A protein has these predicted regions:
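Anion-binding alpha/beta catalytic cores of soluble intermediary-metabolism enzymes, centered on
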Residues: 1-355
């Protein structure tokens, strides 16, 4: 890996959105080609249409297979030959299909090991249906990393879906990703409460899940009321935040990320990132889209790959272990919060229960 540039596959996203605009803008900077070798999975005809409509001059080299990608060039791999009608700002079945074809071809090449990491330009969520699995949806920006315990559920169905087992599973995935993908040696997780006020779910589900995570070696704290947690900027004290459902994590995250957030799936072998915004149909074709979120998605994918290589290196030829690790109990005492316990804290004149 060190002898060659990292190959970054980038799917073109919704052809009626800002995908090509942010891709062309990002690689109009020559330093990007020094960082990696990009392979755009899309359509030369659609790319040329966008480039002309936006009066851009970014050059790309057309290839038919990923093996032909060359360093120092913006390689554009033809994923389909059909004509695609481009209507800026108009979501359509045709643009959805074009997005799906690019993703499908990229996934095929990923299985063959033809590139290193995958970045997806914005597309409608319906064009790439999500499914419940053993992964964790994460959103990352400079200030906070948020993991979602449940996704794509009506709010009325969330309480039943939030279980001790699910919180523990997602918490373990979160911890593993923070260690391997972000190189945080001893990550601390804040777990949000489900309700605006602590109630049944917090006492019977979330608190027991936190205790189980602790038993399994995960530093987990909470439950915290979401409004208080974000309003008081408590996220600065933690390496990750576990939200119980979409809006609980997405709404404050988007405010903090300011359109520069990145979304990824933790707990899977592949590295796949995407800007944390949609196709932005309202500004498509106007030349005003900001490419920084796509840049951040590319940077993060590359960093994750490097972090994994660094993390995995000692595991290839491990040295004999001559000592035993000791947990840092002091960290637990510092951040432990048990709002559902009835015992008073030292500040209230009582004794704090040991964490």
């Amino acid at each position: 890996m060190e002898d060659k540039k990292i190959r970054v596959a980038i799917t073109h996203g919704d052809t009626n959105g800002i995908g090509y605009e942010v891709i062309l803008k990002a690689f109009d900077d020559p330093t990007m080609l020094e960082l990696c070798t990009p392979i755009i999975y899309g359509s030369p005809k659609v790319a040329a249409y966008h480039r002309k409509a936006l009066s851009m001059e970014t050059q790309f080299s057309i290839i038919d297979k990923a093996e032909d990608a060359r360093d120092g060039r913006l390689n554009l791999l033809t994923t389909f030959d059909e004509e695609v009608k481009v209507e800026f700002g108009v979501p359509s079945e045709e643009s959805d299909a074009a997005a799906r074809k690019a993703v499908a071809r990229a996934k095929e090449d990923l299985q063959k090991g033809l590139y290193d990491v995958l970045v997806q330009a914005p597309m409608r969520s319906g064009a790439n249906p999500a499914k419940e699995d053993k992964s964790l949806t994460m959103m990352v920006c400079d200030h906070v990393r948020v993991g979602l315990v449940t996704t794509h559920l009506p709010i009325k169905d969330v309480p039943q879906a939030v279980t001790v087992e699910k919180i523990v599973d997602k918490g373990r995935i979160f911890q593993a990703s923070l260690k391997r993908d972000f190189r945080i040696s001893n990550p601390r997780l804040a777990v949000l409460a489900l309700n605006p006020q602590l109630g049944t779910e917090e006492e019977k589900v979330i608190a027991p899940a936190i205790e189980e995570l602790e038993k399994q070696g995960v530093q987990a704290f909470g439950p915290y009321i979401a409004d208080d947690f974000f309003g008081q900027q408590m996220y600065y004290n933690f390496d990750g935040v576990m939200a119980m459902f979409d809006d609980q994590g997405i709404v404050p995250f988007k405010t903090l990320a300011n359109e520069y957030g990145v979304k990824l799936k933790a707990g899977i072998s592949a590295i796949c990132t995407t800007p944390d915004h949609g196709p932005a149909f309202d500004i498509a074709g106007k030349g005003v889209a900001d490419e920084q979120s796509l840049r951040h998605a590319i940077y993060m994918a590359i960093d994750m790959l490097r972090h994994r290589m660094d993390y995995d290196a000692p595991l290839v030829n491990p040295l004999p272990k001559l000592y035993h690790e000791k947990r840092e109990d002091g960290e637990k005492a510092r951040f432990a919060v048990r709002p559902i316990q009835k015992k008073s804290t030292p500040e209230e004149g009582g004794e704090m229960e040991e964490a």
